[in-house]
Amino acid sequence: MGASSSSALARLGLPAQARPRWLGVAVLGLAAVALGAVAWRRAWPRRRRRLQQVGTVAKLWIYPVKSCKGVPVSEAECTAMGLRSGNLRDRFLLVIKEDGHIVTARQEPRLVLVSITYENNCLIFKAPDMDQLVLPSKQPSSNKLHNCRIFGLDIKGRDCGNEAAQWFTNFLKTEVYRLVQFETNMKGRTSRKLLPTLDQNYQVAYPDCSPLLIMTDASLVDLNTRIEKKMKMENFRPNIVVTGCDAFEEDTWDELLIGSVEVKKIMACPRCILTTVDPDTGVIDRKEPLDTLKSYRLCDPSERELYKLSPLFGIYYSVEKIGSLRVGDPVYRMV
């Protein structure tokens, strides 16, 4: 040990031979302090965020088949790809043409009359004037894998068999259709391809563009004060309905905490002709509620490139933290 080092240790009251052990303890202590400081700084922004209650969960809906009836649930798991209750997953089933192109209530309005329930590990489909269709909740891996086309993007789907195909073909009575199922090992449609100008990074199966759609009952009440034929929430097909807030207050919500789930706003929901399909009759109107919504719910001119001339009603969200939620949960805005 050099003279300068020995004198420094002596000033601390330590013998020269204690240096290796003392320095090891000191280094470990400093490392622990540094790691603790980094962890604290990373956690600090989250701890600092204020929670402002903006409403309460009034309803939760899962739509097992795209464009078919929703299933109301009292609680649900919120996965990165949307709501789940047991083996019911949101929009993990899809009706397609023989060439793989998507079929929705925009083309076949009577799809909204098809209901789905889950019993004994089976999906049960019902529709007017049809015998019920019973399918296993998971399709055999030996079934054909289809290349499906949804709004210009490709995605896989496992065929649900000839019985399901015949059932939907007989019910819709226009052309041959097939039913396919998304599997969790398949690659979803990515946000980078769906909405390349936006920040979030997520995947969806067969929804239009997001894992979640949130609406408020106050906004529907407001619409119904302006329109002759009253609309139902089923016209708009949200996953989460919030009560206890003002009409269109949801326009101002960015990040929300619901139950143990954190979600982040993607964009407002631009509405299309599907909202004009009567959920009770399967008859398409093609005018309302779109005409009324266009009179007061168009986007700001600065956002015209994104939304075009579609009226905005409801908000699309991505799932930032998975968890569970239930009817009655408070909805907090994270500010």
Curated annotation (Swiss-Prot):
Q: Does the keyword Electron transport apply?
A: no
Provide the catalytic activity annotation. Answer: N(omega)-hydroxy-L-arginine + 2 Fe(II)-[cytochrome b5] + 2 H(+) = L-arginine + 2 Fe(III)-[cytochrome b5] + H2O
Question: What would be an example GO MF term here?
Answer: pyridoxal phosphate binding
Every MOSC domain range: 188-334
Ubl conjugation: is it a keyword of this entry? yes
The transit peptide extends across: 1-35
Which Enzyme Commission numbers does its entry carry? 1.7.-.-
Q: How does it assemble?
A: Component of a complex composed of cytochrome b5, NADH-cytochrome b5 reductase (CYB5R3) and MTARC2.
Pfam families this protein is in?
A: MOSC, MOSC_N
- What species is this protein from? Macaca fascicularis
Its topology with respect to the membrane? Peripheral membrane protein
- Mind telling me what this protein is named? Mitochondrial amidoxime reducing component 2
**Cofactor binding annotation:** Binds 1 Mo-molybdopterin (Mo-MPT) cofactor per subunit.
